[in-house]
């Protein structure tokens, strides 16, 4: 039932407050609501925030100038855990009085006509003084005396109650009437790495180099540890391994996904399980569990986290297929059903049937996950979570977080929006997205605005490629396209990722029209000579390193919620800015989407979006090239694909008094959703 005052559209809230919104430690979190009442009396509101441990505190909410029913506040959570907040709204008699006497004074009313207003003002300030501390109490009582002094000019008696000092005191110790409390909403706050992270994917088995005859040698955890030095130097935070478990022998796939393997074929890591073990074992050729623990330790020394693949499926010779046939679907002929996506068949993989023995499956998967957590793994990339029950994932993530809230789960869910965002709502920290297929200016703009608007729900990890996805733009766009896509991914989201080989411009598909790599690393060893490519100038590694450095140096690129697109008079150029409300750091990015031709145009800078005023001039510094320019509202840019595909301009810091408003949640006109 509605209260005395209306409190509507409280944000953030997810699925009717049945699930918590998302945030991380140190993130600027906007809170907003519609607060209203009848008549002309002013209303005010606070956000009442309760940390996981500690006392509740209040934040005064600001009203929009031209839409005063919209109220806003921001806060920065400083600890992990479940935060709660509610909106308290009330009738604000002091603001009502200030508005009334200001209008009457401007209308030229006399002291006699304002007598009742002065009397009411004295009463209000005396009431306010009673609840203020001593120093502020004296200020408020002094104002009451001035208002009551009929020997003073009218404007002096009115204006004494309108100063900024008075407003600050009354914001801190407001007079509140008809207090109405809104619903309690929840925000799940994770560690910062759930939002700010650069991922690099590599296959440990491909790190062994070649033998004397030029044949690939199976990598080990030891050779993988050596490869981590290069990954760390590029500035990545997380190194992700596809499954490191034993690979099935039965129905093993051959090179390029051929149905029959020949002697020496290593198979797909996603066909998990053999006589050597299942999801809790390591592939014998990679090493031992102790070797893996040493690898995790080495990664941490380099400032890297290791992410493991959690692929809940089994090869026909997985121990589960032998000991837990109830985990699968058994056909009429007594065989276990293999995976199918008609007309495709995957004879090397058995999908799990979660409804046959849910308790057994749930407990076994939890045991497997905690096995790796206890070995030092704090991040999991989950393979195809949208093909498993959503209540299972909610149960598993909640259960793991009971003891290990630091564990991050990335959903590899290339699926319909309801599934993708539904999985995010129930607990996945990050999600793959359709960024790979967003190539035009219009599509990129719509995509970026969508994901920033859904920051309470989902955190997009923008991978430029994966072992499964070599987009046509990379196949045909030349080397410049690799730089273009990297620049977009690294600056549009605080989460981005690269699959090994991207820096070598690997671009050949298995056949025309396919997004699969030729000689896919999913089915064979693919050692790479990164150093020779770097020495010969045939590597994107320096540019990727520079992008990660720029990201680390600029907090504006470490947040998801604030992105603003600027008009630029060329469909092949895209321009957008980001601002960090804590530091005031501001960045403006311009990218040439044409990988074969130079593009130029005039950019019309929306000055308010970067904390400036129209007509201002300001200095911009290109973090990529080092060049500096003096800019204004309208500026010329030109980008050449073989020289610089993007400008990443560092702008003047936004002054403190303009920062918070830039972090407010955008509420479109007439958006009155429940």
Model regions: which residues?
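Carbohydrate-interacting/catalytic domains
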Residues: 1-205, 209, 213-237, 299, ...
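Aromatic- and acidic-residue-enriched carbohydrate-binding clefts of CAZyme catalytic domains
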Residues: 193-219, 247-295, 322-359, 518-527
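Hydrophobic faces of well-ordered beta-strands that scaffold small-molecule active sites
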Residues: 198-200, 239-241, 306-308, 380, ...
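Short, acidic/polar
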Residues: 219-230, 357-372, 481-486
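Carboxylate/His-rich catalytic cores and anion/metal-binding grooves
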Residues: 232-256, 310-329
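Substrate-binding cleft/loops of secretory-pathway carbohydrate-active enzymes
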Residues: 315-326, 393, 402, 414-442, ...
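Active-site neighborhood of glycoside hydrolase catalytic domains
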Residues: 322, 326, 330, 353-423
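Catalytic-core region of carbohydrate-active enzymes that cleave or remodel glycosidic bonds
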Residues: 397-412, 417, 439-514, 582
